Amino acid sequence: MVKIKSFSTNNGDMFYIKHGSDNFTIIDCCIDEENKNSILNELKNESKNKSITRLISTHPDDDHIRGLKFLSDNFSIPNFYCVKNEATKEDKTDDFKKYCELRDSDKAFYIYKGCSRKWMNQSDDTRGSSGINIKWPDRSNADFLNALQDAKNGDSPNNICPIITYSLDNSITAYWFGDLETDFMNNIKDKVDWIKADIVFASHHGRSSGRIPNEILEKIKPKIIIIGEAPSENLDYYTGYETITQNTAKDIAIVCEDNTADFFVSNANYKTVPANLKMIYGKNLDGYTYIGSLEYNG
């Protein structure tokens, strides 16, 4: 069984994957004072039987590293994955300082297009792979190098984000884009080896400024796009695609087993259910409302 969780964090991003193998992956961190203990307790509980834990940080925007110091102080992060960068900020918060400390430490593994690592995407006799692969960045690409320089100069680090996939035999395929911007994605759309996916977590929390170009979506052919928690007036609702909007769904949990992904949301009154989800009797998850299941080929 695999569980993918997208936390409702009030305009930020934070996810985890509880793998079917001996792995636990966190993607980004957005923890506020009011939710810090509940998130910490959930992470500890869900990861307690996993030997390998990693945190993948897409980029050091505040809404992707908020609460990182708290998390690091209270939860073991032995493996910190990020794009190699020298991002700077005029306002050096405690969380940004912690990001830089982890980024520049011996805990860091710098991710790039096609990289491999035990047990991110390699198996051995000890444990299986996580199924995490990095589709971007190409470290020699001119647009990416310009984005690195912008981040080093203290400008927006949005376009240093990696493109991450989760895909493993007999499980669902999902994409994360961090906060990549539309213009940047248009520039690299022919530089990425796109694969079809069941789920896409929309770039930049679903904002129009990060709308994934149609040419990319046509290659990915997502069955469901999850739109994040940007202000509603800034969202692109991806007309023509089935979507779940986190502003109203709140926490989203996807439980994958036996070629079926069961979708649960924490808002019991969520009504806008994707048409391609089918209801299967007997699906339950404590504290959540079941909204339907998606069949996939694995």
Task: Describe the predicted segments one by one.
Residues 1-50, 113-196, 253-298:
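Core dinuclear metal-dependent hydrolase active-site scaffold
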Residues 2, 50, 75-78, 107, ...:
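A structural micro-motif
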Residues 5-7, 25, 56, 81, ...:
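Hydrophobic/aromatic beta-strand patches that form the interior of the parallel beta-sheet core
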Residues 25, 33-87, 191-207, 218-225:
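Active-site metal-binding motif and surrounding structural segment of the metallo-beta-lactamase
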Residues 28-30, 58-60, 83-85, 113-115, ...:
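Active-site-proximal beta-strand/loop segments in catalytic clefts of secreted hydrolases
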Residues 63, 89-94, 102-109, 175, ...:
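Internal alpha/beta domain cores that form substrate/cofactor-binding pockets in large enzymes
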Residues 91-129:
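Conserved glycine-bearing catalytic or ligand-binding loops at nucleotide- and phosphate-handling centers
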